Amino acid sequence: MNYFRRVAVVALLTLPCAAQAQSGGSTEAPGTTPSVTVSGSAAIASDYRFRGVSQTDQELAVQGGITVGHDSGLYVGLWGSNLAGWGTFGGANMELDLIGGYKAQLSDSATLDVGLTWYLYPGGADETDFAEPYVKLTGTTGPATLTAGAAYAPKQQAIGKWYDDGAAAAAGLYDHPGAKDDNLYLWGDAAVALAGTPVTAKAHIGHSWGQDGLGPNATAVAPTGGYWDWSLGADATWRNLTFNVSYIDTDISSREAGYLRPSFSKGQDGTGNIAGGTVLASLTAAF
């Protein structure tokens, strides 16, 4: 993946230049809306949960992202977070997501979003990075915003079943070296703004389908092969700051995930359920 990482770095370095060139005052008439917009965020969270599973070993997460959008609907973005424990793909202590897509306004209240997320793990092993196309349909009605989405990662080595269980991974003995597998994730989100308050109630549910073993780096996108994740929470916004508190859980029990240990555990020492229910708090600053 070294070649692809170099391509990603070059693309990211050109984003600010492209944005500056396209949004300069010389190309926009006074009073008109810029054709290119740049937005970003920085956040601190008590844990980084990806589809209900901790990627920071149930410890603090520091995250940030930037998006460059064009009024045609095209956009590119970059998002990153620290990692620990199970989340460290091939020894990487950082996740870097390169995102590109297109948003189409279907009506005043409906938007279709089609794109691709490229999950990068700088400093990790060779077989870590993988690509995942997605599609999202979002609609609004009154104070409610509803989203339905699907993300499908085609067969790739980084998400293949190289180990049948955690014991094989701990011993470093591949059961299926070079294996490629795919992964499907379907989800739904709901957000309801509470009238007269800065609070928005939020709910999420998703289901993952993938291989039931461990990949080349003793991790997996869909631990146990298939599971549900869900969350209930609320946002409170003040100016450009958003405080969120959510309860997050999955239906992966400690007993069910036992065969994936020690990889699938806190500290990767065989103890603790990193997919169990937890209260997560985060503070995000938008700019």
Task: Mark where each language-model region is.
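Outer-membrane beta-barrel biogenesis signature
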Residues: A19-G40, R49-Q55
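Residues on the lipid-exposed face of transmembrane beta-strands in outer-membrane beta-barrel proteins
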Residues: A42-S46, G64-H70, L98-Y102, L116, ...
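Transmembrane beta-strands of outer-membrane beta-barrel pores
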Residues: I44-F50, G80-A84, A104, W118-P122, ...
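Outer-membrane beta-barrel translocator domains and adjoining extracellular loop/strand segments
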Residues: F50-D57, W86-M94, G123-A131, A158-A167, ...
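Repeated loop/turn-to-beta-strand initiation elements of outer-membrane beta-barrel proteins
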Residues: S72-L78, D108-V114, P143-A148, G196-A201, ...
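Surface-exposed loop and membrane-interface regions of Gram-negative outer-membrane beta-barrel proteins
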Residues: L74-D129
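Detector for outer-membrane/organellar transmembrane beta-barrel domains
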Residues: F130-A222, Y247
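Outer-membrane beta-barrel "beta-signal"
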Residues: A236-R239, T271-F287
